[in-house]
Amino acid sequence: MQQDYLSQQRFSALPLHPIVRGALAKKGFDFCTPIQALSLPISLNGRDVAGQAQTGTGKTMAFLTATFHHLLTHQDPNLKYPHPRALILAPTRELAVQISNDAEFLAKASGLKTALAYGGDGYDKQLQAIERGVDILIGTTGRVIDYVKQGVIGLDEIQVVVLDEADRMFDLGFIRDIRYLLRKCPAPQARLTMLFSATLSYKVRELAFEDMNEPEYIEIEPEQKTGHRIKEELFYPSNQDKMALLLTLMEDEWPERCIVFANTKHRCEEIWGYLAADGHRVGLLTGDVAQKKRLSLLKQFTDGDLDILVATDVAARGLHISDVTHVFNYDLPDDREDYVHRIGRTGRAGESGVSISFACEEYAMNLPAIEEYIGHSIPVSQYETEALLELPKPYRLKRAVPPQGHTRHRSYHAK
């Protein structure tokens, strides 16, 4: 992590439980990020926090540190706890899995057990893990409610509640589920509650007011909505040139880890077909992709076995992927906030990133609202039609496709 991204607050100077402090030091956590520096002095003191922070700012470690500290300092060694003592809710299963992975080193050091509860698959495996005993339950609202209604778990011993990406939970229609679960937990005054959201909108503040105990609000505002470490670039391609321009820029930029966004499932499939035919190691992430395949693709991408993900906004929500070097907006999004969410997947945690957008004939009308929202014009670049690569015959999903991890090679079939 870049030093200029960190604050002057050291973890070692915070009143942390010795086990948590030691685990953080062993993992290489020395200085806090700004959201950690602001939130931890509050949460470690047992007070509720409602924080505004984008993904990639260190908020996950902020609430995990506070959660493990609180459980370790509020446990009776003479008692056995048959039910979870902490509940961490996320809007998507992928984010829940990521949080669980991030918590592993703290769980190992402390002896506290974590378990996952998310829909899609793994029902019996998750159930077995919970029945073996769990201190910290991490999951999505639907599956957690299933287990509560079946009597598999009770929430009456919950000491910590975390709501991550609360604004996305609202967007996905989970607010009724959240309130159901919170009503099953002890009263707000009897637990520590932490809420994090990219925006502290009226509806998020209303939830905090009703279901938290006088939370302290903290906000980490980026210097600009799109992040000053992200290099933005805009092209005006014709519909005819658009795909060839994407392939040409892929050859020119040769991104180490890239996400290409499009507005529809059909367009994503088309992009995947051309990139795969051009020899790129590319995965497709749309709402139709099965849960096991989604997790497999995410692991391949994270491990470096895939270089490119082609995704819709809905399918990519909640994905926390480090070291993304490039984001391509093949289609400008209809929602201006989605532009910020998309390109915010690069340039995280102090690293630099590149965002390249296409203002084509179909979606150029979305550009004025986007530029008004981000507060600046996106620099425009030109291209020469004669220099664009010739399009290969695309792969089709209906046909047999090559393995997604086949060897990547450069294409030299320019016009």
Curated annotation (Swiss-Prot):
Keywords assigned = ATP-binding, Cytoplasm, Helicase, Hydrolase, Nucleotide-binding, RNA-binding
Short motif (DEAD box): ranges:
164-167
The record lists the catalysed reaction(s) as:
ATP + H2O = ADP + phosphate + H(+)
Q: Where is the Helicase C-terminal domain?
A: 241-389
> Motif Q motif residues?
9-37
Citing just one GO molecular function, the answer is: RNA helicase activity
Q: Name one GO biological process term.
A: RNA catabolic process
Q: Is Cytoplasm set as a keyword in this record?
A: yes
Q: What is its main location?
A: cytoplasm
Domain Helicase ATP-binding: residue ranges:
40-218
What's a GO cellular component annotated to this UniProt protein?
Answer: cytosol
What InterPro entries does this protein's entry cite? Answer: DEAD/DEAH_box_helicase_dom, DEAD_box_RNA_helicase, Helicase_ATP-bd, Helicase_C-like, P-loop_NTPase, RNA-helicase_DEAD-box_CS, RNA_helicase_ATP-dep_RhlB, RNA_helicase_DEAD_Q_motif
Q: Which family does it belong to?
A: Belongs to the DEAD box helicase family. RhlB subfamily.
Q: How does it assemble?
A: Component of the RNA degradosome, which is a multiprotein complex involved in RNA processing and mRNA degradation.
Q: What does this protein do?
A: DEAD-box RNA helicase involved in RNA degradation. Has RNA-dependent ATPase activity and unwinds double-stranded RNA.
Spell out the NCBIfam families in the cross-references. Answer: PRK04837.1
Return the protein name: ATP-dependent RNA helicase RhlB
Species of provenance: Haemophilus influenzae (strain ATCC 51907 / DSM 11121 / KW20 / Rd)
Q: Gene behind this chain?
A: rhlB
